[in-house]
């Protein structure tokens, strides 16, 4: 695996105004409110429709080593920034794929939010230990699950008794909020309102610098390899993206055995500026290639990589990440933000009172979905 140099911010994304990026905080490129609701629903339906895979099916995936690499990156982020007893807010939690990671971090309370009803029910099943791919051991923390569009709903109105949270996570999903300025702002407003001062926001999302660079390097409007492709519409034929209109830059993304739906470009330096308006300061941002090369130098994370098997286990399993999968990894970055302010001297003790150790469908809160 060769480490690629970090792409510099694209000049066409430079010098954006800090505050308002257009009238009324709405969308761009013709994306109106009803269309954005429709796009959010399409994304939700796509992920809900994906069935839970058995371990055998998962191991036979054409991108199994990429999935293991992604899990390693998320595990490293959680190990670096979560602490025993932490209260966790997991935005776009999906089917609960990170529950075991949080359990290993010995967190004290977990709230998962996802727009897809099918996914949140699968998350409940996984939490209860009822799937054939999960251990039978119970999780050590109480949990609460909410079915809601976390880029539209005011989550603080529903979670004020659960807050504040010590850590918030949004994995491979925050870019879906950048369809409009209003949704992007609501996403960050939710994080800021629910995190305690000094709390951290960890996440992963597409690296806009890499995606735009790839687009400009290709002759047409589509690029990819044997396991993925990205396609931009003809409205971007000039391959220019004015900094004054950073929202609603849509592309189609297909990844074998994983994703097949519209996504949105997130110019990261503008994301950083927007986050600062919500008292969220950047702590870390690294492209996945840079992240892997840096944290593989630490023995505990190298051992974790061996156990997960993204690069083989160093013993019988000699299979490893393909070049195509490694190229997909280059499309993503990891980030960490911290909420301004001094953390409280004493941890609030009653966050977890609303959680349960066993969940039924009646326990799932549905907020306007």
From Swiss-Prot:
One Pfam family matching this protein: mRNA_G-N7_MeTrfase
Site annotation mRNA cap binding: residues: 95, 101, 126, 175, 263, 332
Keywords in alphabetical order: Methyltransferase, mRNA capping, mRNA processing, Nucleus, RNA-binding, S-adenosyl-L-methionine, Transferase
Entry GO terms, CC: nucleus
Residues covered by region (Disordered): 1-55
Chain positions recorded as S-adenosyl-L-methionine binding sites: 74, 92, 114, 149-150, 171-173
Compartments, as annotated in UniProt: Nucleus
Family annotation (PROSITE patterns): RNA_CAP0_MT
Occurrences of domain mRNA cap 0 methyltransferase (ranges): 61-340
Annotated InterPro entries: mRNA_G-N7_MeTrfase_dom, mRNA_G-N7_MeTrfase_euk, RG7MT1, SAM-dependent_MTases_sf
GO biological process: 7-methylguanosine mRNA capping
Compositional bias segments (type: Gly residues): 22-32
Reactions listed under catalytic activity: a 5'-end (5'-triphosphoguanosine)-ribonucleoside in mRNA + S-adenosyl-L-methionine = a 5'-end (N(7)-methyl 5'-triphosphoguanosine)-ribonucleoside in mRNA + S-adenosyl-L-homocysteine
UniProt keyword Lipid metabolism present: no
EC number: 2.1.1.56
Keyword tRNA processing: no
Chain positions recorded as mRNA binding sites: 70-71
Biased composition, class Basic and acidic residues, residue ranges: 33-48
PANTHER family for this protein: MRNA CAP GUANINE-N7 METHYLTRANSFERASE (PTHR12189:SF2), MRNA GUANINE-7- METHYLTRANSFERASE (PTHR12189)
Function statement: mRNA-capping methyltransferase that methylates the N7 position of the added guanosine to the 5'-cap structure of mRNAs. Binds RNA containing 5'-terminal GpppC.
Family the entry assigns: Belongs to the class I-like SAM-binding methyltransferase superfamily. mRNA cap 0 methyltransferase family.
UniProt name for this protein: mRNA cap guanine-N(7) methyltransferase 1
Organism this protein belongs to: Oryza sativa subsp. japonica (Rice)
